[in-house]
């Protein structure tokens, strides 16, 4: 039988052995959020020295109030990223955008009257098609994607109060409006 050489395995060791790489994560200069790594939250930048190329680093971009996470500067669009298999330095920036959903503050109504709710979205990442409406915590599915909804008050709604709010979502980030509370009266005035 031929004897296979047993020395070949030693030459295939990792070529990046002994090299150091730097992994740097930053928040875009316009701000709008922070970075968190495990329980370490609220960072504007985090830097790691990577001596083991198989090391894995997980960083999450956390949008501030009224902001959504847009993307990482290298094109990744999920707010949590895990980098491993380092062959070179990494330097990425988390980009955030503003999004807000203003809402009217209060309303009262009676049977037969109707309400119109409008969400005046602001910020280029607040898109109408990503808008969802909720009444008392339940999504109003037929209102999805509409910036204006009209509700006609019927007798089943008398003496009830409804909390209405709108949420716009972008890349898994949710921005909510204020909650509008409506109280429906019977319409009978004494």
Over which residues does each language-model region extend?
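Conserved "repeat-terminator" motif of extracellular CCP/Sushi domains
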Residues: 1-3, 17-27, 81-98, 164-166
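Short, solvent-exposed loop/linker segments at the N-terminal edge
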Residues: 48-53, 107-113
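Surface-exposed, flexible coil segments in extracellular/virion-facing regions
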Residues: 74-85, 134-153
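Short strand-edge motifs at loop-to-beta-strand transitions and within beta-strands
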Residues: 44-48, 57, 79-84, 90-92, ...
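Extracellular modular ligand-binding repeats in secreted and cell-surface proteins
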Residues: 38-67, 85-88, 158
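Proline-enriched interdomain boundary motifs that mark the N-terminal boundary
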Residues: 97-106, 189-190
């Amino acid at each position: 039988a031929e004897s296979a050489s047993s020395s070949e395995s030693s030459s295939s060791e990792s070529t990046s052995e002994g090299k150091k790489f730097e992994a740097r994560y930053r928040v875009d200069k316009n701000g709008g959020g922070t970075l968190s790594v495990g329980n370490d939250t609220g960072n504007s930048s985090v830097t790691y020295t990577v001596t083991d190329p198989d090391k894995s680093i997980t960083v999450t971009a956390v949008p501030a109030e009224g902001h959504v996470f847009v993307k990482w500067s290298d094109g990744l669009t999920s707010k949590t990223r895990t980098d491993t298999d380092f062959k070179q330095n990494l330097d990425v920036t988390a980009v955030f955008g503003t999004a807000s959903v203003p809402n009217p503050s209060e309303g009262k109504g009676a049977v037969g009257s109707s309400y119109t709710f409008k969400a005046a979205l602001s910020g280029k990442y607040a898109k109408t098609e990503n808008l969802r409406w909720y009444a008392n915590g339940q999504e109003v599915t037929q209102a999805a994607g509409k910036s204006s909804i009209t509700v006609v008050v019927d007798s089943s709604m008398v003496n009830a109060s409804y909390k209405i709010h709108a949420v716009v979502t972008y890349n898994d980030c949710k921005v909510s409006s204020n909650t509008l509370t409506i109280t429906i009266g019977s319409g009978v005035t004494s």
